[in-house]
Design a protein with these regions (language model features):
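Acidic, contiguous N-terminal accessory segments
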Residues: 2, 8-94, 120-128
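Substrate-binding groove of N-acetylhexosamine-processing glycoside hydrolases
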Residues: 12-15, 20-21, 28, 119, ...
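Conserved, mostly hydrophobic/aromatic
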Residues: 34, 103, 139, 160, ...
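Structural motif
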Residues: 34-40, 65-70, 100-102, 142-144, ...
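Feature activates predominantly on carbohydrate-active enzymes
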Residues: 78-228, 232, 238-242, 273-274
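Active-site-proximal loop/turn and secondary-structure-junction residues that shape catalytic pockets
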Residues: 145, 156, 174-176, 213-217, ...
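Active-site groove signature of glycoside hydrolases
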Residues: 232-258, 280-289
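Disordered, acidic Ser/Thr/Pro-rich linker "stalks" and the adjacent N-terminal cap
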Residues: 568-571, 589-638
Length: 638
């Protein structure tokens, strides 16, 4: 693959497979000739005309050729167009602009790249040959908790189109008409109209709207339920849906029978999917959807592999419910299901750590396994706008994993979502990326930029106050920057849905920074009265943080608001406890050094339970419930 950069640096999302940039730009012509506009993908032509708004289409001017492989308008470029689904060829020079897709979606993606190239009425001279490495790329709305709003979903679909994602799987666990007991019933008129609008917007943005059904908890393996399921699919078909999925995840009982599941899915495939020429391949999520849950002595996965029609896609989350995808892991599952796995990546989903925001970078997935998977979709948070940071990165990874740049893509995502306060959002996101202790044992790096200074300072201070001044100043600057970022974010009006989602955490973030500043002033300890003033302020800040934690985000699972929990908060708490201890020793005092710790610990030999976080509410100690079926030994308990 050829990638040349000259004086002009061209950055594209996702990174193309082949890009040649000449050291020259041209002005977008005031007058142009559109060649092929009547034949080409109408969604692509619409985007082009919007970009050329105010320009004149005539028989003179620069030639702009647009179309799909085989069209007369781009026929002479047939050899340049990549022979891949959704591939495209794009060329810009002083004589002609060429936007040629291998298929209609490829042409649309050529326009999305063209839109990124166009800046201030100028275009770089480029030649691009591009195509996706992974066939299905997108999002599965499959989390527990508050489903996304209709407006949020509309915004998401437009975001996917811009970032060359082609799949949105609609499967919110709390939609009553998606799962038991109402999966057999049609949607009410209002909800049906909204779904119809979502399908239309998905089509305009070249996204496959995949409607998923979750019947396993109460399905009866009889003809009546088969007919009811097909009737429901037919209802969705009439609303415009052309892609379907069946989920058997997180269930127990008779619905987990792999033989019966395969029979039902093949029936759907043969009696519905294959009968209608405009329906895409059927997708299923198995009951044993990760390696740790697969019965080593059972035949669930191999039964699906042997019995399911070859065209049916099988979803997979990895070695665990929450895990990154490795070569060994995907080889293991592909051998059993006899087809490339369709990856359901459970990040940044936070339905098991709902008191945290997961705004950090996307990393950990093998970048050399594109050919081993048929799809890669991310399961997001219930916070739709905040999830776009990770979604943007997944779009880049799934399109061209070998050129995926973790940190640059993360920074670009933040700049895309909130350009007017990108530095402030980056500061906030840097310290809001870890999940904290959780039942799945999945963690993320956080506050990496200051972690070394924090560790050095804390170690030295605990050992006798001989800390390095540079480390101390680094921490001071960090807390100052956190406060500034919080204030700027709270007043930002550029992306109101985003700010509304993160506001409780931003308030907590600011209080955390203020507490950090005051604790460092206690460390400097000018005199006894000054120390006591700062001590009292810290205790007041602790109370304010407790109030936010008790009053905001009060979901029934992991209520509250946690921020900067991996490095920043432990640093502040341990420094506070240490400096109070030193003060008490020096002045024979008895100041309380308690921080907001959890005095209780969960002890269990059940893997899914032992790491579940605890909560204290008044005189009660609560265990955060698991979303999935809890298993131990040969028994299953819900």
């Amino acid at each position: 693959m050829l990638l040349l950069f000259f004086a002009q640096n061209v950055s594209l999302q996702p990174p193309p497979q082949q890009l040649i940039v000449q050291n020259k730009t041209i002005d977008l012509p005031a007058v142009y000739q559109l060649n092929g506009g009547e034949e080409a993908n109408p969604h692509a032509v619409k985007v082009l005309k919007e970009l050329l708004s105010g320009k004149q289409n005539s028989k003179k001017g620069m030639l702009i050729s647009i179309g799909e492989k085989g069209d007369k308008s781009v026929r002479k470029y047939s050899r340049q167009i990549p022979d891949h689904e959704e591939g495209y060829y794009l060329s810009v020079n002083e004589k002609e602009i060429v936007l040629a897709g291998n298929d209609e979606r490829g042409t649309y993606y050529a326009l999305q790249t063209f839109a990124q190239l166009l800046k201030d009425g100028k275009l770089p001279e480029v030649e691009i040959k591009d195509y996706p490495s992974v066939r299905y790329r997108g999002v599965v709305e499959g989390f527990y908790g508050t489903p996304w709003s209709h407006q949020a979903r509309l915004s998401q679909l437009k975001f996917y189109g811009k970032n060359k994602m082609n799949t949105y799987i609609y499967g919110p666990k709390d939609d009553p008409y998606h799962s038991a007991p109402n999966w057999r019933l049609p949607y009410p008129d209002k909800e049906a109209a909204q779904l119809q609008e979502l399908v239309a917007v998905a089509n305009e943005n070249e996204v496959d709207f995949v409607w998923a059904i979750h019947p396993g908890q109460d399905i009866k393996w009889n003809q009546e339920d088969r007919d009811l399921l097909l009737a429901k699919f037919e209802k969705m078909y009439q609303l415009g849906v052309r892609s379907f999925a069946v989920f058997f995840d997180d269930i127990s009982g008779e619905g987990t029978n792999p033989q019966k599941q395969a029979e039902l899915l093949n029936y759907i495939d043969e009696k519905f999917v294959q009968v209608k020429p405009d329906i895409n391949q059927l997708v299923m999520c198995p009951t044993e959807y990760n390696k740790s849950w697969s019965n080593p002595n059972g035949n669930y996965l191999t039964t699906l592999g042997d019995k399911l029609n070859p065209s049916i896609q099988i979803m997979w989350t990895g070695d665990r419910v929450i895990s990154d995808i490795t070569r060994d892991g995907i080889s293991w599952i592909n051998e059993r299901i006899k087809r490339p796995a369709y990856i359901w990546w459970n990040f940044p989903v936070s339905d098991y750590v709902r008191d945290h925001l997961l705004l950090g970078p996307v990393y950990g997935n093998d970048t050399t396994i594109a050919k081993e998977m048929s799809g890669f979709v991310t399961n997001p948070m219930e916070h739709a706008e905040s999830s776009k940071i990770a979604i943007y990165s997944v779009a880049s990874y799934a399109w061209n994993p070998t050129k995926y740049d973790t940190w640059q893509t993360w920074k670009d995502a933040i700049r895309t979502i909130l350009p007017s306060a990108a530095e402030e959002l980056e500061c906030f996101a840097m310290h809001n990326s870890d999940l904290g202790p959780n039942g799945h044992g999945y963690r993320r790096e956080e506050s990496m930029d200051i972690q070394p200074a924090a560790e050095r300072f804390l170690k030295a201070f605990k050992e006798g106050n001989n800390y390095d001044k540079a480390d101390f100043e680094t921490l001071q600057y960090t807390f100052e920057r956190m406060k500034e970022s919080a204030d700027i974010l709270l007043m930002n009006t550029e992306n109101k849905p985003l700010i509304a989602e993160i506001t409780p955490w931003v308030h907590q973030f600011k209080l955390t920074a203020e507490m950090g500043e005051e604790v460092l002033k206690m460390v400097e300890g000018r005199n006894e009265s000054y120390f006591l003033r700062k001590y009292n302020h810290v205790k007041a800040l602790q109370q304010q943080m407790f109030y936010i934690d008790q009053m905001s985000n009060q979901n029934p699972y992991q209520p509250g608001v946690k921020t900067a929990t991996r490095v920043i908060k432990p640093l502040i708490d341990q420094t506070f406890a240490t400096v109070v201890k030193f003060f008490n020793q020096k002045f024979n005092a008895h100041l309380d050094a308690t921080t907001d710790y959890m005095p209780h610990k969960m002890i269990s030999n059940v893997e899914q339970i032992k790491n579940l976080p605890l909560q204290v509410k008044a005189n009660r100690v609560l265990i955060s419930p698991a979303n999935e079926v809890v298993k131990w030994g040969s028994r299953k308990q819900c």
